[in-house]
Amino acid sequence: RARETAEAIARPHGLVVRTAEALNEICHGAWEGLTVEEVRARFPDLYRRWQETPEAVTMPDGESLAQVEERVRGELIRLQPLHAGETICLVSHDVPVRLLILGALGLPPERLWSVGLAATGLTEIEYGREWATLRRMNSVGHLGELVTSCAHRAH
């Protein structure tokens, strides 16, 4: 879905979409392909901990928030000098976007669930050499009547 979204954004501007694995969603490992109900049933203790202390959880055969944060931050560090003074559009997934927002606000990963996101919500972060400013977060105005006040909390 992220690639389709990126292509829809790029097409009218004649831009080419480039993919970066560093912006992939957190690897849920053994949870991949399961519904929330199935995860709760098969991994009740781990799921509870994911809700309460996500920063302390590594999913079986999956990733931790620290690992996701490291790869996303690495991609930002790689992109910044290549696009200094330019506007770029990164299209990613729930956990990486939440971590980018937390980083811009100077908040730790344990605040993951403090950030509410809607599907296709737009977030704008301006980066300097030593700073980040959150300009817009989870804007869904482009969806018009499709969205009401119900930003989802999918975790």
Q: PLM features: what roles do these ranges have?
A:
Residues 1-47, 155:
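Phosphate-coordination/substrate-recognition cap region in phosphate-metabolizing enzymes
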Residues 3-4, 74-131:
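Active-site-adjacent alpha-helix immediately C-terminal to a catalytic or transition-state-stabilizing loop
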Residues 46-67:
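Short glycine/proline- and acidic residue-enriched helix-loop micro-motifs
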Residues 43, 54, 72-76:
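Short amphipathic alpha-helical/adjacent loop interface patches that line ligand
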Residues 22, 62, 88-95, 137:
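Short, well-ordered beta-to-alpha junction loops that form the rim of enzyme active sites
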Residues 135-155:
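Acidic, His/Gly-rich catalytic cores of divalent-metal-dependent hydrolytic chemistry
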Residues 40, 65, 69-73:
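Amphipathic, non-transmembrane alpha-helical scaffold segments
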